[in-house]
A protein has these predicted regions:
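FabD-like malonyl-/acyl-CoA
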Residues: 1-148, 272-294, 298-309
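Alpha/beta catalytic cores of group-transfer enzymes, especially the acyltransferase/condensing modules
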Residues: 10-12, 39, 106-253
């Protein structure tokens, strides 16, 4: 067994996420309290009792998803103590902001440091967002076709932002370009789904946010990782602190090539993928990334609540 832990990104959040873990594991609860103190706000109350509208603001979403993921990770360690070593965790990865959760789980950053940088990152991205920009999910096409059709409309700014799985890609840019692209893609994709976001994330339109957060990332006191980080920007397993920082800085305007990254992990022998956090988005993507031949050898599991935690080894042993 060679295990990779996966941490979700924006879009997986919902009101009430992580509540049963908070109520049942002392270290998970302590982690929530740490974030409240660091950010000087009752983020826990927002996560459990707030509104979707407030939670989806990126300066709230990003630290919220991180703390839920880390609370679940700490609950796993509390539940299994030394038994967790049996998983043979050899790497971690996160989708966009999830990369910071991965860094925290790997011991590179403290919970407080991670919450602080994600709050700042989310705030810069929120300020950089524009009502005239957005994102569109393209289902049932391929990146070559998508890129050719982007080129054909000669956009002001429209780029592939996320290559999520086989047949699922997200484009990001100006709404006027997205509308032209939708017309161009008629008959070339199964579905085109506008995403409920107020910005063109992972595109050049986020350059100001990237510039503004660069110094904050540079100042981070990143420790050597316990597990190598498969980073979004480079697509490589990183352990060097300077490389980790550079990739974090460049990630905001660069595409998340998740599909390619996960294929890389499979090629390097990873056979067990455990998503830790709200919902099961990455689990669903992973099931579409693996080939029919690989499905027999690869285990894909998501953990987002107490029941999932307590049945983890049953799933691993029985699947």
């Amino acid at each position: 067994m060679k295990t990779m832990l996966l941490f979700p990104g924006q879009g997986s959040q919902y009101i009430g996420m992580g509540k049963d873990v908070y109520e049942n594991y002392k270290y998970a609860k302590k982690a929530f309290m740490q974030v409240n103190k660091e950010l000087n706000t009752d983020l826990t109350n927002l996560i459990f009792n707030g509104t979707e509208e407030e939670l989806k603001k990126s300066y709230n979403t990003q630290p919220s998803l991180m703390i839920v993921s880390i609370a679940i990770y700490l609950a796993l360690k509390e539940e299994y103590v030394d038994k967790l070593d049996e998983l043979n965790i050899c790497g971690v990865a996160g989708h966009s902001l999830g990369e910071y959760s991965a860094l925290c789980a790997s011991g590179c950053l403290s919970i407080s440091e991670t919450a602080k940088i994600l709050s700042a990152r989310g705030n810069e991205m929120f300020k950089c967002a524009d009502n005239n920009t957005g994102m569109l999910a393209v289902i049932g096409s391929d990146n070559k076709t998508i890129q050719e059709n982007i080129n054909s409309i000669k956009p002001k700014c429209l780029v592939i932002a996320n290559s999520n799985s086989i047949g699922q890609t997200v484009v990001s840019g100006y709404l006027e370009d997205i509308e032209k692209f939708k017309i161009q893609m008629e008959g070339k994709a199964k579905r085109l789904i506008p995403l409920p976001v107020s910005g063109a994330f992972h595109s050049p339109l986020m350059q100001k946010a990237q510039d503004n957060i660069k110094n904050e990332i540079e100042k981070l006191d990143i420790k050597n990782p316990k597990y190598p980080i498969l980073q979004n920007y480079s697509g490589e397993f990183e352990t060097e602190i300077s490389s980790i920082k550079t990739n974090l800085q460049k990630q905001i305007t660069a595409p998340v090539l998740w599909c390619e990254n996960m294929q890389n992990a499979i090629q390097q022998g990873f056979d067990t993928f455990i998503e830790i956090g709200a919902k099961n988005v990455l689990t669903g993507l992973m099931k579409r990334i693996v080939t029919e031949e690989q499905k027999e050898k690869i285990k894909i599991i998501n953990i987002e609540n107490v029941e999932n935690i307590k049945t983890l080894f049953d799933k691993i042993n029985n699947d």
